[in-house]
Structure formats: C-alpha cells, structure tokens
UniProtKB/Swiss-Prot annotation:
The keyword Methyltransferase applies. InterPro entries: DNA_methylase_N6_adenine_CS, HemK-like, Ribosome_uL3_MTase, SAM-dependent_MTases_sf, Small_mtfrase_dom. It comes from Shewanella oneidensis (strain ATCC 700550 / JCM 31522 / CIP 106686 / LMG 19005 / NCIMB 14063 / MR-1). Pfam families: MTS. This is Ribosomal protein uL3 glutamine methyltransferase. Belongs to the protein N5-glutamine methyltransferase family. PrmB subfamily.
Length: 314
C-alpha cells in the first residue's frame, strides 16, 4: 500500500467511523477473502479497529463519531495494512476468535475456530444424546481446544480429553484451558489420535474436526488459509486419511450408547463414494455449514469390516 496513501489516511481521517469506512474500502479494493470468523468487510473492520482501540465490539453506535489520536490512527492503519498485504486472517492479528459463545486465544500454531459443530454443542448433540449420561468426552485433533472447552461448558459435569499430535497446538489449548477456567475437567495431551489412551469403552461422545482437505483443494485455497498450519488442513489424496483411522478405531473407545461426530467438509463426497453401505447421518445446520456426520457405536461395530484395513496397531 503506497506510503502517501497511508499518510493521507492518518492525516485526513478523524473518527472511528472514518477508519471503519477506510478499512472496508481497502478490503474491498484488495479483494481479501473472508472465511475465518466473518463473511464481510464491515465485520472485519469492526474487529480490527475495535481491537486496536481496546473497545468491546458490542459498544453503542455513538462511539463511531469519536475522534482518534494520531497514535491510535497509526495503530489501526498498521493492522489494516497487514490484513491486506500479508493476507493474514483477522484472528491472527487480534489473537482472538469466538466459538460457541466463548473467546479463545489463537495464533498461527492452530487453525482459526470455525466449525459448525458449535451449533451441535449448543444443542447438546441432540437428539442423539438426549436423556443419556455424558460423563466423558474425547476431542480428537483438538487444536486450540475450542471444541473440547465448549463441550465442557455445555456438559458441566463431564471430563474432556483433548488430544492432538502437535505440541504447538497443545500449548495454545493449554492457554485456553487455563484462561477459561476448566483445568479440572479438560485435559490436553499429545497423541496420534487414540495412541495415548488405554483401550476400552470410556467415552460417551467422541468428537473431531480433523484435517480433511484433499490434494486438489489444498492448492486452490485462498492465501489466508496458507497462514494456518498445514498439519491441521491436509489429510492425503482424498482428505480422509485421519477420518478413516477414526472410523476404524472409535468403536472400541465408546460406551454402549456413545456416538461419534466428525467434520469432513467437502470430503464428504469422497467418504460417501468409498463407503456407500455406511449409514452416515449428515447433520443439517440452521446457522450454515455442512460435512459433519454422526454414527452410533452400534453402527460403527456393524460396519467394522469396511474399516479394518485402517485400524491402528495395538
């Protein structure tokens, strides 16, 4: 972005509203991609400007007319320039992301939380878990810990094991566990899927948002996604390397009334093509999103022969 253009913004713009308008114009002109917690330029501008000013996004409209100091304008412009030039997702610039009504710390060690599973958590995974005990939950590929922690908030008597192979991701998850006050019920641990936990029926719910982007899609993703850790996105030729292992192993860790919930995004097409006999229930979301399936323990056991070649060695 031209220095003269930036100096002009700092010199001539006066109010918060001016900066919001300028940010929206810059985002639209640069054709940035929205897919990390917002879907439009205005919400991105609000997030960056209010973060720079240490203001809550829910503050009244009257503040829009407030004048800015020179240092405040410089700080805002710097964030907007980074968003445009580097194509950094807003949550990596603010280190904040909201998920299931909670605010999480995030940085480039983890994916930005955005799973539609948040809606299922708010609905307590109904109807599958209605009236059933939920004492222990397993979150595979936990990343920032957002799903695990949100589950702990919704099921306030349950313990949640939050597993990930990435030590970097687990460091972020631990920050969120401590910040959100669930140290006594959410337990991050390093594990290659199920490798770190003893075999046996112990979880009433296994939930996972694993890597699921296939080889074809990974190269076509907008620049913003390339700031996220590749280990959290790519999963082989068809995007299902980890999902197949989860399907092959999950049943032995579920209680008799337990369920498996997995997000596979666009790779749902590959999954249905490869396993047409499996009765996946694909969740319909009111707030947008797709590619999340549910299977019961009994359904997993019934179709274990289809997944046998993907089972981890014991």
């Amino acid at each position: 972005m031209d220095k003269i253009f930036v100096d002009e913004a700092v010199t001539e713009l006066r109010t918060i509203g001016d900066m919001l308008r300028w940010a929206v114009s810059r985002f639209n002109d640069a054709n940035v991609y929205y897919g990390h917690g917002t879907d439009n330029a205005w919400d991105e501008a609000i997030a960056l400007v209010f973060h720079a000013l240490h203001l809550p996004e829910e503050i009244g409209q009257q503040v829009i007319l407030s004048n800015l100091t020179s240092s405040e304008k410089h700080k805002i412009v710097e964030l907007i320039i980074r968003r445009v030039r580097e194509r950094l997702p807003v949550p990596y610039l603010t280190n904040k992301a909201r998920f299931a009504g909670l605010e999480f710390y995030v940085d480039e060690r983890v994916l930005v939380p955005r799973s539609p599973i948040a809606e299922m958590i708010a609905n307590r995974f109904g109807p599958w878990l209605y009236g059933k005990p939920v004492n222990r939950i397993l979150d595979l590929c936990t990343g920032s810990g957002c799903i695990a922690i949100a589950c702990a908030y919704e099921f306030d008597e349950a313990e949640v094991d939050a597993l990930d192979i990435s030590e970097d991701a687990l460091d972020v998850a631990q920050v969120n566990v401590e910040t959100l006050g669930v140290m006594d019920r959410v337990f991050p641990m390093q594990s290659d899927l199920f490798s770190a936990i003893p075999e046996g029926p112990q979880y009433d719910l296994i939930v996972s948002n694993p890597p699921y982007v296939d080889e074809e899609d990974i190269g076509d993703m907008p620049d913003e996604y390339h700031h996220e850790p590749a280990i959290g996105l790519a999963s082989g030729r068809d995007g299902l390397d980890l999902t197949k292992r989860i399907l092959a192993n999950a049943a032995q860790y579920l209680t008799p009334t337990g369920i498996l919930v997995v997000e596979v995004g666009n790779s749902m097409v590959h999954l249905m093509e490869q396993f047409p006999e499996v009765p996946f229930t694909w969740v319909n979301f009111e707030n947008g999103g797709d590619g999340v399936f549910v299977l019961t323990r009994d359904q997993l056991i019934e179709h274990q022969s289809l997944f046998a070649i993907y089972r981890d060695a014991q």
